[in-house]
């Protein structure tokens, strides 16, 4: 993986389905876990909640294993058009801001302050069908690294 793939249109690049594999490490305790599942990036439903905005609805679902216990997990985000085709404004499902994203160079670092914690995400695009995020979460009670690999499935 010797370089980054620039992305001219971030929403077009993300659209579709992805297989997801995530490792979660607690650097303070040494605990580790995994998530495996799928992520879809699709236009919002025309008649349901969220139909008043443009962009893509990101829905992730799968199984999260932590300290020997496996349970279902899911999350939803909104990827809205940003200040250019390579940019997106990423928001939580309820519309609160999460972070900006600009994949014009194929790599981007975003920060999200959350109370006393700081979430720093590094986004890397390898090719048309593979990308990765690495989130480092630090704060008084958190010292985590979450590494997620996405592989296009449709």
Predicted features along the sequence, with ranges:
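Soluble ligand-binding/transfer domains with enclosed cavities or grooves
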Residues: 2-154
């Amino acid at each position: 993986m010797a370089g980054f793939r620039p992305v001219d249109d971030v929403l077009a690049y993300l659209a579709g389905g992805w297989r997801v594999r995530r490792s979660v490490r607690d650097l303070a305790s040494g605990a580790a876990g995994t998530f495996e599942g799928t992520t879809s990036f699709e236009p919002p439903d025309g008649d349901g909640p969220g139909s008043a905005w443009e962009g893509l609805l990101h829905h992730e679902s799968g199984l999260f294993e932590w300290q020997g216990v496996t349970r279902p997990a899911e999350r939803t985000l909104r990827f809205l058009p940003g200040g250019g085709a390579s940019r997106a404004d990423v928001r939580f499902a309820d519309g609160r801001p999460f972070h900006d994203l600009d994949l014009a160079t194929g790599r981007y670092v975003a920060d999200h302050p959350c109370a006393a914690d700081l979430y720093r995400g590094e986004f890397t695009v390898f090719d048309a069908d593979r990308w990765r995020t690495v989130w480092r979460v630090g704060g008084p009670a958190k010292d985590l690294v979450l590494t997620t690999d996405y592989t296009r499935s449709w």
